[in-house]
Design a protein with these regions (language model features):
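Flexible helix-coil transition and linker loops at the boundaries of alpha-helical arrays
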Residues: 17-18, 51-54, 88-98, 132-137
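Alpha-helical segment of the N-proximal tetratricopeptide repeat
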Residues: 21-50
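Start-of-helix register in tetratricopeptide repeats
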Residues: 26, 60, 95, 102, ...
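Residue-level recognition of tetratricopeptide repeat
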Residues: 33, 67, 102, 109, ...
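Extracellular, repeat-based ectodomains that mediate carbohydrate processing or recognition
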Residues: 167-604
Length: 604
């Protein structure tokens, strides 16, 4: 408003009838009251200053209009209208009830943005309970909740209203996202994130015109899916067995040999190897029984990671032998002629023999260069810190191999002696203990085969932020790509309930870099950000902290699972999406199932 309320000579203040803080209303006030009850803040904010100043119900109309402006973030206008309402005769108790009610509504919207439906509903109900109007009923609270949830979803994904519809999604930083196809693969286990942990390698893969994925339907059923890309025909086959799904580490990884035989490894957390392969090329109906690979170092397996055939190199499996703070990264290679696996004798990464403490290297997704080179980045995990059991990941390391893991080099070309340890491995980005550095994120290579790594760790204010580091051939650089304000702590054992997912990274043929993630700032929806230049301050990062929504529904605690093979071939992003719970530490599961989606997107 351009005029100060106290100086307004045209307004006609009238006494406000209040009994116990309850307002009697009629006429135009009834319309505004209904708009307030339903949370139609935009309509309340459209009441013109002239209408307010000249209406006999100026005090109450100004108060309700102020509530609308405050909910829309128009703080100055809302404040001026509050002054007008008080000057026009509204008592402070009534004004206070409206303000406190607005606080609860804001809390509800915040909870909804974070994907927490139950607290959101409770806050909206409390907002209505504090209404200064008579006879506001539970039905009004339900109506308010529906309207506010709809507004929240529209704010997050304004161009989409339902999951399976295709269309152009909202853009940022010149980013255009097109959803091209979505396939409902059926209901499946969703009591934790075992189907959607980011470290599945591969969770989806494309080979020879077919796209493959797999997930757990329940504790007795593992489903393998084959999609024929030419006609989008979906075939499935269920592998019966006994699967421990109550530990989200026990995910499924897929590989394929050059003949088209699918390889699958699953259900591990420092336990005996479980592995099968398909009996026929490009087919999923017949499988071997569970078999060993070599039988050597296969009793404490976690994180099976298949590295696909390329440049004359065979199918390879990288895996952890050991536990979280005493482990070795080992490699096995597959001979298609004999159908036998062979062990590399020396681990490539190990902290198992360190003294006076042991450690373990957690690797990010391996990346493959255009020349067939193999690139790894990793953090080191030691014992937890203190009685609080703070997760202690330190430093980001990097190495690359020109010969499928036989020899390794630093980013500057210096040879590495195997096994690489905390002592002799290259640290490309130092991160101190207790910094909430997350393990097992993602890495990709640009057109010069130079590494880009995304992760999160604390900023200088102790708040975990998404970060991107990369090597330009001479030096490593860093940028933030979030501007979070709420701290959290990685603490305890098992799979944690964390407000943000680990990020995925994609680089297109023009060296544009994208990050895919979900979290508290996106209402737990899956989003993508286009990363721009070297911007190492939180202020600069905030300018690009405006991600584009990929999927309009909350996925709760799921992480991005992508088909990196198809992206590299055709710049098509395919994701496996499912809404998942994740009890902290994998304790106290609540049985649930949710649909699994296979969805194609284009980014431009």
């Amino acid at each position: 408003m351009s005029r100060k309320p106290a100086a307004n000579k045209s307004a006609k203040p009238v006494p406000v009838s209040v009994a116990g803080g309850l307002i009697d209303d009629d006429g135009l006030l009834a319309t505004a009251r209904t708009q307030w009850q339903f949370g139609d803040w935009s309509s309340l904010a459209q009441i013109s200053p002239e209408t307010l100043e000249n209406h006999p119900q100026c005090a109450l109309l100004a108060l309700l209009s102020a509530a609308g402006h405050l909910q829309l973030g128009h703080a100055d206008t809302g404040r001026n209208l509050m002054h007008l309402a008080l000057a026009a005769g509204c008592d402070t108790r009534t004004a206070a009830r409206l303000l406190i009610s607005g606080v609860y509504n804001t809390l509800g919207r915040t909870a909804a943005m974070s994907g927490h439906a139950a607290p959101a509903t409770a806050h909206f109900a409390r907002s209505i309970e504090l209404s200064p109007f008579r006879n506001d009923s539970p039905l009004i609270a339900q109506a308010r909740t529906r309207e506010q949830l709809a507004q929240t979803e529209q704010a997050l994904c304004p161009n989409q209203t339902s999951a399976p519809e295709s269309g152009t999604l909202p853009t940022t930083a010149g980013l255009k996202v097109q959803q091209l196809a979505a396939f409902d693969l059926g209901q499946a286990w969703s009591s934790n994130t075992v189907n959607t942990v980011i470290f599945r390698h591969h969770g989806i893969l494309t080979w020879g015109g077919y796209q493959y994925t797999a997930f757990y339907v329940d504790e007795a059923t593992l489903r393998v899916v084959r999609r024929t890309l030419a006609n989008n025909h979906i075939a499935t086959h269920d592998l019966a067995g006994q699967y421990n799904l109550r530990d989200a580490h026990n995910s499924i990884s897929l590989g394929i040999d050059s003949a088209g035989h699918l390889h699958i490894s699953y259900d591990h957390h420092a336990t005996k190897l479980r592995y099968r392969r398909s009996s026929h090329p490009n087919a999923i109906a017949d499988w071997t029984d569970e078999i060993a690979m070599t039988g050597v170092n296969e009793d404490r397996v976690t994180y099976p990671t298949f590295i696909l055939p390329r440049a004359g190199y065979p199918l390879t499996m990288l895996y952890r032998d050991g536990v979280h703070n005493k482990g070795s990264a080992r490699i096995k290679t597959y001979d298609e002629q004999t159908r036998n696996w062979t062990d590399r004798p020396t681990p490539i990464l190990s902290g198992a023999d360190q003294k006076p403490w042991t450690s373990n290297a957690y690797w990010n997704h391996p990346a493959i260069g255009s020349d067939g080179s193999l690139h790894l980045s990793f953090v080191w995990r030691t014992d937890s810190i203190g009685e609080q059991q703070l997760v202690n990941n330190v430093n980001i390391g990097y190495a690359w191999s020109p010969d499928n893991g036989l020899s390794w080099f630093t980013s500057r070309g210096q040879p590495c002696k195997l096994p690489m340890t905390q002592v002799n491995a290259e640290t490309v980005w130092p991160v101190s203990p207790g910094s909430n550095l997350i393990n097992q994120t993602s890495m990709a290579l640009d057109s010069h085969n130079r590494p880009h790594i995304v992760f999160y760790a604390n900023d200088s204010q102790g708040v975990p932020q998404y970060q991107h580091i990369w090597f330009d051939g001479e030096a490593w650089h860093q940028q933030y790509f979030s501007a979070r304000t709420q701290p959290f702590t990685l603490q305890g054992g098992g799979t944690l309930q964390i407000p943000i997912s680990r990020p995925e990274i994609l680089i297109d043929s023009q060296d544009c870099v994208y990050a895919v993630y979900r979290g508290d700032l996106s209402g737990n929806r899956m989003v993508v950000s286009k990363l721009l230049g070297i911007q190492a301050s939180r202020e600069a990062a905030h300018a690009q902290d405006n991600p584009t929504c990929l999927w309009p529904e909350t996925v709760d605690y799921a992480e991005p699972v992508i088909d990196r093979t198809r992206w590299c071939e055709s710049q098509m992003l395919t994701m496996l999406l499912q809404r998942n719970q994740q009890p902290n530490g994998d304790l106290a599961h609540q049985e649930s199932a949710a649909p699994v989606w296979l969805v194609d997107f284009s980014l431009s």
